[in-house]
Amino acid sequence: MILHPAKTKSMLLATRQKHQLRPLILNLSLKDNHIEQVHEHRHLGIIIDDEFSWRPHITSTCKTISKNLYLLSQLKHFVDTSKQKLFYYAHISPHLTYASTVWDGCSDILFHKLNSLHRRAAKLMMPDLSLTTDAKLQHLG
């Protein structure tokens, strides 16, 4: 593998406590080019931070899903439920499931943020008050 010095970044992985105790700055170079040290990096659509907290990734994902939920709320006035589901499966569900096995170990607080958006999508598409939100989620699959 050949490294491209201008595109290469470095990241020091440690817990939050270790970063606070000794903020370490790496001074690395490759072929006389300084390698930039970063605290987070997007790779294949996943944002990895130097603490492996998944907070930046899930925050970004929630922002994207929220925008799409707004579009879904506007769309529901013009199309039937089957078209809403199509929009959900094309524009919301992939963000909830992409690489979920990687960031599955996130904190309960971050998981709750994603879950609340998922539940909001179910409520938007199925306003039937006789169904519980869990039943609506099961209906979505």
Question: What are these model-derived regions, one by one?
Answer:
Residues 2-39:
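Short, conserved micro-motifs composed of acidic
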Residues 1-12, 18, 110-141:
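Short, charged alpha-helical motifs in flexible N/C-terminal segments and linkers
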Residues 52, 97-100, 104-107, 122, ...:
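Hydrophobic/aromatic-lined pockets within catalytic cores
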Residues 1-5, 75-82, 102-104, 129-132:
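Surface-exposed helix-capping loop/turn segments at secondary-structure junctions
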Residues 25-30, 58-63, 137-140:
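Short intrinsically disordered coil segments
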Residues 32-102:
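Basic, alpha-helical interaction scaffolds
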Residues 82-90, 108-119:
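An alpha-helix initiation/capping motif
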